[in-house]
């Protein structure tokens, strides 16, 4: 946000889901700062429009598509917007996510299915909608998973299952569509997004104490990792998961 990092995405278009806030918004800004045209797909109209307006005000290119990642026609509209507005589609960042905590015996079926739909089925639908273009352009995909795919935390069965599923999906897609399309996952840890605004101050303090870096991460830091995985700098990186958690999962598994 605010200042060109490089031009390594010049002439490319990237579709980012959940780009209205948090990691998605930071990623959209980062890619635009590096020369990409960005299509934002989000079901929150205000946030999606805000990100697109901020990018275009900076002199970069962006478009917003209102829609839910679980809705196939929304994906069709987003891909069409990339074609009509920017002439190509070169990358996909499947970032939209949903977490509704609760242990398995207290989690409703609708909450389970809701998280499965957004976190996993939404990514599948996006990949399917974008693959023809990405194969033609030798593009790249980044799926936003979570350290919850690696470690267990209380009352997160649906979220953990879907995020672990994303890492498996990423590996499989890399095998099925390489060497033409690269597919990787990014696994954020304790990142200061909107979800953390409701966390008690004591819990925030404990999280910092249990993080090797000694602090929470910021959406811009995850966006930098996503930009790397999408870029030609990662041309020999596919089928892997990049953990961006300040060493939190290392600490949790070493004590």
Regions found by a protein language model. Give the residues of each.
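Short C-terminal tail/terminal secondary-structure segment
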Residues: 2-5, 151, 227, 238-255
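Short, small/polar-rich loop/turn modules that mediate ligand/substrate recognition or access, typified
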Residues: 93, 178-182, 237-239
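Substrate-binding pocket helix/loop in short-chain dehydrogenase/reductase
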Residues: 103-104, 108-116, 196, 204-207
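Active-site helix of classical SDR
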Residues: 127, 162, 170
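Alpha-helical segment proximal to the catalytic Tyr-Lys
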Residues: 132, 174-179, 235
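Residue(s) in the substrate-gating loop at a strand-loop-helix junction
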Residues: 146
């Amino acid at each position: 946000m605010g200042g060109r990092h490089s031009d390594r995405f010049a002439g490319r278009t990237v579709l980012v889901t959940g780009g209205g806030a948090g990691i998605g918004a930071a990623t959209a800004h980062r890619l635009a700062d590096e020369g990409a045209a960005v299509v934002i797909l989000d079901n929150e109209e205000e946030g999606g429009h805000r990100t697109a307006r901020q990018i275009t005000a900076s002199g970069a290119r962006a478009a917003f598509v209102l829609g839910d990642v679980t809705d196939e026609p929304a994906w069709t509209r987003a891909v069409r917007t990339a074609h009509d507005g920017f002439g190509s589609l070169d990358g996909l960042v499947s970032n939209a996510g949903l977490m509704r905590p609760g242990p398995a015996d207290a989690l409703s079926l609708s909450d389970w299915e809701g998280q499965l739909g957004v976190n996993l089925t939404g990514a599948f639908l996006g990949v399917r909608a974008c693959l023809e273009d990405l194969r033609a352009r030798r593009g790249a995909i980044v799926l936003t998973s979570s350290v919850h795919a690696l470690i267990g935390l209380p009352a997160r069965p649906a979220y953990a299952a879907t995020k672990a599923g994303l890492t498996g999906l990423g590996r499989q897609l890399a095998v099925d569509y390489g060497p033409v399309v690269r597919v990787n996952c990014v696994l954020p840890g304790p990142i200061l997004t909107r979800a953390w605004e409701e966390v008690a101050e004591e819990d925030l303090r404990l999280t910092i104490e249990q993080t090797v870096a000694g602090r929470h991460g910021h959406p811009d830091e995850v966006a930098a990792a996503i930009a790397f995985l999408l870029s030609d700098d990662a041309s020999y990186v596919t089928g892997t998961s990049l953990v961006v958690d300040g060493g939190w999962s290392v600490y949790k598994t070493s004590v």
